[in-house]
Amino acid sequence: MLEFKRAFNAQTKFHSTVHEEFWAILAQHLLSQLDLPLDRARVYIGPGQSLQGLYFHPESPEQAFGTQLGNTIKPKFKDRDFMIALKTDFNLTLNHHRAPLKTSGSIPELFLPLVTIECKQYIDKTMMDNALSAATKLKAFSPFTLDIVTIELNKLSDVNIAGSGLDGFYILRKQKLSEARFRNGDGPKDTVDVARRNPLDNEVILKVYEAMKNHIESNRWHCDEEAFFEQGFVTNGL
C-alpha cells in the first residue's frame, strides 16, 4: 500500500476521503427536515457545473448585427465540488429569436446554486486566492448563493477572507498539513499519512450544517416596502 500512497498527493481522489459525498448526505437530511414547499424533482445535490454568467460573444459581425442575435449569448459555467442547486430549463429570447443556450456536457438543465462548497483535503495560498476570486465572481451573478470552503488540513500561514464573496472557511480536522505528513519523507511533497490525521471535528461539521440550514431558511432574501417600514431595516441575508 505504501507504493500507492507515494504515487498520489493529498489533492487527488485516490486518498481516503468522502468529502463531497459527506456534504451530500447531510444536505439530503437537511432538506428532509425543512418545512418548505420543496419540489424535490427540481433540487440537485452533489458535484456539477453551475451557471455563473452570460456573455455576448458573436462569431462574426454578420451574426452580431443580423437576425441571429440569440446565437451570440453564451453561458459561463463553474465546476462545483458540491452544491445544493435548482434544476431549471433556460430559454432566452432576443428580438423574437430563441437563443439556443448549450449547457456543458449536453446536460438538459441549468443548475442555479443556493449553496456551493469548495472541498479540499488541504489548501495553499494559490488555491485560496483562486477560491476567493471564484467566490467574488459568483456573488456578482448570484448574490444570494451561500459560498463556503471546507478543508481537512491547513497549509496557510494566514487566513483572511475579508473583501471577497466567500461566506465561510472551515477546517474539518483542525490540523496543519505538516502535522499529517509522512514522518520520514516516504511519499511525494505534501502527501498525507492518513494514520496521522486528526478525526473530523463534530463542532465544525455542525457549523457548516447550520450555515446551510440558516441560509436556506432565511426569510430576508427580499424585503418589500411594507416589511421594510415595519422592521426598519434590511440586511444582506444575515
Describe the function of each predicted region.
Residues 86-88, 120-123:
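Short, flexible loop/turn elements at secondary-structure junctions
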Residues 46-107:
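Active-site metal-binding core of divalent-cation-utilizing nuclease and nuclease-like domains
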Residues 129-147:
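A contiguous pocket-lining binding segment that forms or flanks enzyme active sites
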